[in-house]
């Protein structure tokens, strides 16, 4: 212990004398460990830390793969009768609960308590929270009586309770007015349970209501997402086989039972498993960054060790054995590593807070934090980093000390060929690793820009939207149409408005499908209820036929507009205008128009079949969204819309205008999140590599000053000297870039699943990265080369005792 204390004291004195290098090393280690700890915290939240439920490992997501056998699992819903079957017939599930999927954001309006506000409801079966092990912070959970009574029992989300209710614990038992109907608050959910953070990132749930399981809700069709809990000892494979067998049994109830093809997966896999490839890429990237950090610091310590060669040789001559010298130098490295880890921990705290508050729609991202596991990782990273970057200089310098002892002590400024080769190899490795990161970041960045540039089939820029509802609830059909007519009349007459329309579904939102059949041809298009003017307001181009008009109402024949994909599916090679499809309506629905295919679900998903119905003829919607496009700024447009709509409905929340482009941008936030992180790592790696090149070339110039002086004295021009140094710089950069491009070529094939619109061998990226690296390397070597070209040969040779010019 005394020896360790002595080593620490000696190391502190040594680092204090060379405070500039110590500061630079601490900063480099801090940035590296800060990035590593931040990425570990994200990976821990998304993939490693248990979900905030009781025994989360036994929870199972039960999806219906009815519309996509063989495709990736999705949240396709199931029927109430399917839930009953699993509850009553399964031996491997201890419980199965459901979540209603068709409540949309803003379906409900809170009034009578300050400014009207749009609320979003979640409906769940009464047994969901007990099954998950969720306990209320205040009040109680739902009871079977809450499901059947008319009291309107609700649970408030913790966020809504804190934001709107002012965190008042006395809210339990009080009533709120939602959609002009009183509801009773029976409890407040805990902060640890945030449904949207886990299952619907980027959205918001304000209150929860019980979902009844009865014949009425069963006849509504596929409406539920199911979560089950396995019995102790039950396996996923056995549960899958049992659920498949139960779904295949004949059903004796309602003949209109939908098909159920159960697909089971661990709940954790459903929540965040889709982000595993991205997290593996980020983890690998931060590993490369740490290797560059270690190589850079090894180079710094090797350079510093040359100036300490005399000191080390004296200690060896005084009896210090090689093991003691190595331990002393490793102690210095450990101090630098732990100082950097302290800085890195502060950076990780700030980084995780920033990521948790970002708008990236990634499950569990809001729960990213520096916890005990992250602290342990930081300590481990400090230990490993200190050993890795300190071991090579320690072994190399101690070996030199024992070979040279005091004999070469006066030549502390010289550097042997072996150590020079080692420093060059470290720089080459830095350049190669930086090249790999730059190629990966470049491919993802190119993919991201391709996503932004994709033709959506509509024009999101310049359009805003607001959820509107008739004030009378529930409105009659006549009241609803009159309300919508007046809203559209006011908006279309407002100054600066170019087009306005209504729709029940916004872009990049959950939508429903309807099955359609023409002869033997089938299609399941997404459906939208829209008004006249909607196509113009969204910038959707008609390919054939006409748009909806005011005359397309209950008094007229049922009409619809289809997109090119649906037309091709039902009437391939034929003109769809005038064709008809029979649905539930006594009369067939006639096609009056064809529009281009649109990427309404995500910008990355190819357009699929869609059908549009007149909002005047179809009642299958709740509230609708007003969409307006204007010639003025978005701020002026929203101000004008507030002025014209407020007299129509004083209870209409006017602070919830949304920009259509913002909705599209939010859908790309996970990809933007990955691109920004990887680009940051790549830039950091490039900076470290350039520092490494600068350090090696600068040190090479200082150690070869006599050689340069002799060349200058023999007639070499400053330009020739500078050229020679730059060639040495580019040689290191070229070797590193060549190795890095080969490794990047392999990496690019691994990350193909994360790319969009570019190939893994994208020549633009693979050409641009070497240009960037060689340019940066040239700049890094320019200053040392210019200094070498300006050396005075007379002064240089006088400083060399072997030249005979001393004195």
Where are these regions (language model features)?
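Short, strongly hydrophobic transmembrane alpha-helices
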Residues: 18-46, 50, 292-295, 341, ...
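Small-residue-rich transmembrane alpha-helices
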Residues: 42, 298, 334-405, 443-446, ...
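Conserved G/P- and acidic residue-centered "switch" motifs that form tight phosphate/ATP-binding loops
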Residues: 37, 139, 157, 187, ...
């Amino acid at each position: 212990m005394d020896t360790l204390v002595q080593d620490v004291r000696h190391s502190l004195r040594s680092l204090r004398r060379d405070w500039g290098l110590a500061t630079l090393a601490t900063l480099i280690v801090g940035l590296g460990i800060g990035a590593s700890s931040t990425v570990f915290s994200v990976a821990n939240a998304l993939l490693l830390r248990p979900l905030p439920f009781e025994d989360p490992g036994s929870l199972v997501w039960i999806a219906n793969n009815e519309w996509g056998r063989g495709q990736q699992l999705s949240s396709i819903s199931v029927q109430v009768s399917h839930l009953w079957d699993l509850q009553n017939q399964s031996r491997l599930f201890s419980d199965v609960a459901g979540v209603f999927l068709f409540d949309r954001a803003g379906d409900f309006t809170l009034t009578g308590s300050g400014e009207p506000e749009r609320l979003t409801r979640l409906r769940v079966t009464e047994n969901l929270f007990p099954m998950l092990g969720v306990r209320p912070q205040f009040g109680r959970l739902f009871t079977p009586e809450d499901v059947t009574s008319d009291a309107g029992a609700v649970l408030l989300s913790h966020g809504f309770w804190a934001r709107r209710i002012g965190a008042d614990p006395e809210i339990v038992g009080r009533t709120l007015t939602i959609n002009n109907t009183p509801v009773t608050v029976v409890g407040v959910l805990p902060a640890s349970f945030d449904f949207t953070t886990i299952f619907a990132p980027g959205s918001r749930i304000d209150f929860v209501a019980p979902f009844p399981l009865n014949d009425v809700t069963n006849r509504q069709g596929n409406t539920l997402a199911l979560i089950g809990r396995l019995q102790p000892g039950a396996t996923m494979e056995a549960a899958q086989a049992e659920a498949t067998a139960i779904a295949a049994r004949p059903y004796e109830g309602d003949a209109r039972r939908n098909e159920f093809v159960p697909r089971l997966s661990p709940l954790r896999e459903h929540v965040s498993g889709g982000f595993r490839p991205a997290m593996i890429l980020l983890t690998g990237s931060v590993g490369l960054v740490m290797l560059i950090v270690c190589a850079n610091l090894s180079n710094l310590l090797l350079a510093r060790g040359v100036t300490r060669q005399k000191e080390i040789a004296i200690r060896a001559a005084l009896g210090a054995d090689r093991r003691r010298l190595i331990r002393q130098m490793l102690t210095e490295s450990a101090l630098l590593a732990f100082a950097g880890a302290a800085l890195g921990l502060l950076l990780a705290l700030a980084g995780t807070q920033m990521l948790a508050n970002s708008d990236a729609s990634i499950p569990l991202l809001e729960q990213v934090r520096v916890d005990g596991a992250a602290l342990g990782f930081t300590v481990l990273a400090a230990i490993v980093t200190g050993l890795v970057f300190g071991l090579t200089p320690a072994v190399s310098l101690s070996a030199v000390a024992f070979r040279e002892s005091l004999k070469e002590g006066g030549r502390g400024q010289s550097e042997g060929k072996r150590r020079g080769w080692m420093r060059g190899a470290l720089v080459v490795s830095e350049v190669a690793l930086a090249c790999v990161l730059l190629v990966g970041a470049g491919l993802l960045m190119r993919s991201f820009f391709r996503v932004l540039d994709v033709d959506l089939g509509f024009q999101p820029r310049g359009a805003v939207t607001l959820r509107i509802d008739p004030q009378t609830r529930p409105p009659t059909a006549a009241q609803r149409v009159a309300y919508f007519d007046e809203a559209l009349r006011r908006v279309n007459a407002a100054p600066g408005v170019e087009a306005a329309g209504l729709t029940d579904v916004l872009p990049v939102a959950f939508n429903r499908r309807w099955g359609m059949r023409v002869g033997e041809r089938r299609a399941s298009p997404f459906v939208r209820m829209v008004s006249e003017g909607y196509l113009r307001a969204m910038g959707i181009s008609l390919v054939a036929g006409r748009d909806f008009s005011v005359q397309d109402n209950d008094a007229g024949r049922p009409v619809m507009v289809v997109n090119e994909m649906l037309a091709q599916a039902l009437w391939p090679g034929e003109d769809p205008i005038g064709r008809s499809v029979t649905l539930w309506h006594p009369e067939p629905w006639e096609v009056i128009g064809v529009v281009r295919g649109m990427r309404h679900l995500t910008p990355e998903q190819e357009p699929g079949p869609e059908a549009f119905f007149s909002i005047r003829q179809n009642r299958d919607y709740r509230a609708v969204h007003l969409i307006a496009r204007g010639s003025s700024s978005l701020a002026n447009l929203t101000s004008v819309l507030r002025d014209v709509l407020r007299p129509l409905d004083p209870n209409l929340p006017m602070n919830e205008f949304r920009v259509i482009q913002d909705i599209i941008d939010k859908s790309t936030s996970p990809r933007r999140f990955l691109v920004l992180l990887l680009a940051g790592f790549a830039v950091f790696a490039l900076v470290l590599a350039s520092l490494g090149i600068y350090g090696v070339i600068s040190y090479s110039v200082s150690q070869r000053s006599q050689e340069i002086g002799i060349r200058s004295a023999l007639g070499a021009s400053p330009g020739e000297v500078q050229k020679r140094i730059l060639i040495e710089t580019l040689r290191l950069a070229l070797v590193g870039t060549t190795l890095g491009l080969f490794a990047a070529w392999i990496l690019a094939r691994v990350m193909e699943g994360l790319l969009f619109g570019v190939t893994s061998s994208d020549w633009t990226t693979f050409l641009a990265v070497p240009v960037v690296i060689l340019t940066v390397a040239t700049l890094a070597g320019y200053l040392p080369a210019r200094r070498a070209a300006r050396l005075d040969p007379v002064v240089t040779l006088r400083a060399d005792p072997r030249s005979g010019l001393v004195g």
